[in-house]
């Protein structure tokens, strides 16, 4: 499958661009000197969050989990000692609320997204990024949240090997 994306120069000041996706959606891009839109490197993290987020929430619903709030955030570190300032480490945190959430269903949803379904995870993990896949289950007010790491993917992972049986200690 071929996906087409184009970027056109915005007729204005600064270095703003309008990105038009193959599905016809547009977004404003800017560099670090402006504030008109997202920086391209930020969009990698948005893509990571969106791709795994769709996978995980779909799996939770298929697993009959009642989710009252779901948020996925990605925090990443860039190297600063050399250019390009590539991402080297990221933490993907899935924060979930709901009555009687099954922790194992959540762990499995995150694992399957990270190893089988998330194209963005596969691409970033094949490159330079070590990605920590974590979750936090938020309970009723006053209760301590449950937090854990499901797995780590990358760096330099073979995208075809993601989802294959791993050595002892791997989550599934």
Task: Identify the role of each PLM range.
Residues 1-46, 57-172:
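Extended beta-strand/beta-hairpin segments
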Residues 48-52:
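Alpha-helical metal-binding/catalytic segments enriched in His/Glu/Asp
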